[in-house]
Amino acid sequence: MKKLFFAWIMALWCFPAVFAQSGQGISYQGEAGMGAAFGVGSNAYNRFVLETVHGVRIGPRLFVGLGGAWNYYSARGDMPDDSFREYTDGGRSFVPIFADMTVYVLDRRISAYLKVDIGYGIHKHGGIYAAPAVGVKFGLGSVLALNIDFGFQVQQQTAPDTSSGLGGIVLRAGLSF
């Protein structure tokens, strides 16, 4: 995991030099959003999601950045609430720290995009975090845009005697600036 974060930091550091003479702009971009994930699989826990990502927009179609989120979980269906608390010492939250890459399909006010977040969910029994998604960006001005995406989110949960994934179908909305 340390190697992955180091690779992202090196990539962010090197991109300005790579594009310096190509005429493509590099600028700061921030994103903030929230949403809900609906649990699927054997560990079907719904969750509320808050996240923020900050990084660089490279040309009109590529964004790379680092982000953090807060995922608050709740039980669903026949999953007893105590089964999750047993592995999290009563807590229901994971705090994923991740690298984000977004590719915009078009250089227009309204554009589809593909995005992927890969990182680690910080918690006593945290683990790998991944969240690929597809979405649509609606430009609201020269810099501000509304983003709506749909994807899948998985948070690995590890404990001394078990390891399981907490998967969910996620719907998010947010602003990029």
What are these regions (language model features)?
Residues I26-Y28, A44-F48, G91-I97, I110, ...:
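Residues that define the transmembrane beta-barrel architecture of outer-membrane proteins
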Residues R61-V64, R108-A112, F138-L146:
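Repeated loop/turn-to-beta-strand initiation elements of outer-membrane beta-barrel proteins
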Residues M1-I26, A173, F177:
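Bacterial Sec-dependent N-terminal signal peptides
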Residues Q21-F38:
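Transmembrane beta-strand segments of Gram-negative outer membrane beta-barrel proteins
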Residues M34-V40, W70-S74, V103-D107, I118-K124, ...:
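Transmembrane beta-strands of outer-membrane beta-barrel pores
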Residues M101, G165-F177:
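Outer-membrane beta-barrel "beta-signal"
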Residues A75-V116:
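Helix-adjacent hinge/juxtasegments
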Residues Q21, F38-N43, F84-G90, Y120-H125, ...:
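Outer-membrane beta-barrel domain signature
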